[in-house]
């Protein structure tokens, strides 16, 4: 499992999650199974875990434990699946690590990384229809500019979109190398990798509809918790962290606090930690992909 993905903030997240050793918990992002395995290790024989992942590669990491139910699904459907599993009355905690797994980054043919010459794929669910190739070759310039600006927070998003559209007029952009060549004139010197990472983030988020999935997940997860149940979420970039922070505060991703007739806030959660928990220096030294992680904890009211 460590070769597939090193779980981030493992002790901090699982300790925050578990309130009862015989409780029922969900790991919404199974990945390499690191968080799930640690939850199972700490639970009593009566405890149960339901884990989710849409990547078939991740499903192969299933530990041999009768207390685990592993479901291949986008986590946006977590509430529906938990009801189907007989947990309609609510569960004790839900954990989600929103990062891309090391396996996905390091498997060249998946197309998640600019470090390899590979097809522009980026699908977390390899049976999904749309790939990054479809986006860079099929989206109008205005659409490309929008996703680069919003999802990647790319400074010169319009220039990048123009270069992509110009390059594909000559020939389709089908590989990571071809994309890099198409936009290389707009890459800032001494910060090429950081800039490319933002471009790839934007494409990946669009391919996998990550923000829409996250919004539906937050809503479903808050409904799936019993009162006092914990929602524990690890974020990696400002866009998703803002969504999680706003949802914990207000019950919606805009962060707009709504009140009932009596003036009471109607948000279903309350924050457990005012400021996010960050990885220790030792963890970052051992796993550089943990450096941007933020852990937020909320409790169902």
Language-model segment annotations:
Residues 1-301:
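S-adenosyl-L-methionine-dependent methyltransferase catalytic core, i.e., the SAM/SAH-binding region
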């Amino acid at each position: 499992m460590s070769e597939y993905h090193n779980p981030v903030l493992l002790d901090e997240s699982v300790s925050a999650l578990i309130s009862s050793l015989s409780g029922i918990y969900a790991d919404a992002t199974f990945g390499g199974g690191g968080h799930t395995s640690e939850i199972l290790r700490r639970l009593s024989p009566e405890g149960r875990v339901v884990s989710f992942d849409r990547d078939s590669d991740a499903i192969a990491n299933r530990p041999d434990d009768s207390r685990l139910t592993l479901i291949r699904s986008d986590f946006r459907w977590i509430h529906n699946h938990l009801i189907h599993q007989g947990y309609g009355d609510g569960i004790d905690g839900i954990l989600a690590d929103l990062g891309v797994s090391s396996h996905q980054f390091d498997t060249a043919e998946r197309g998640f990384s600019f470090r390899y010459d590979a097809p522009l794929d980026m699908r977390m669910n390899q049976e999904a229809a749309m790939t990054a190739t479809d986006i860079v070759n099929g989206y109008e310039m205005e659409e490309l500019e929008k996703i680069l600006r919003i999802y990647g927070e790319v400074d010169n998003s319009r220039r990048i979109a123009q270069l992509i559209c110009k390059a594909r007029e000559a020939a389709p952009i089908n590989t990571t190398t071809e994309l890099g060549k198409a936009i290389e004139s707009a890459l800032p010197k001494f910060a090429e990798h950081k800039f490319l990472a933002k471009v790839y983030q934007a494409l990946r988020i669009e391919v996998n509809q990550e923000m829409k999935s996250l919004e539906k997940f937050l809503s479903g997860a808050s409904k799936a918790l019993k009162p006092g149940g914990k929602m524990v979420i690890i974020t990696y970039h400002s866009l998703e962290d803002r969504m999680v922070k706003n949802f914990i505060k207000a019950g919606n991703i805009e962060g707009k606090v709504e009140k009932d007739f009596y003036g009471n806030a109607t948000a279903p959660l309350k924050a457990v930690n005012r400021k996010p928990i960050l990885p220790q220096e030792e963890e970052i030294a051992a796993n550089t992909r943990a450096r941007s992680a933020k852990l937020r904890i909320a409790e169902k009211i």
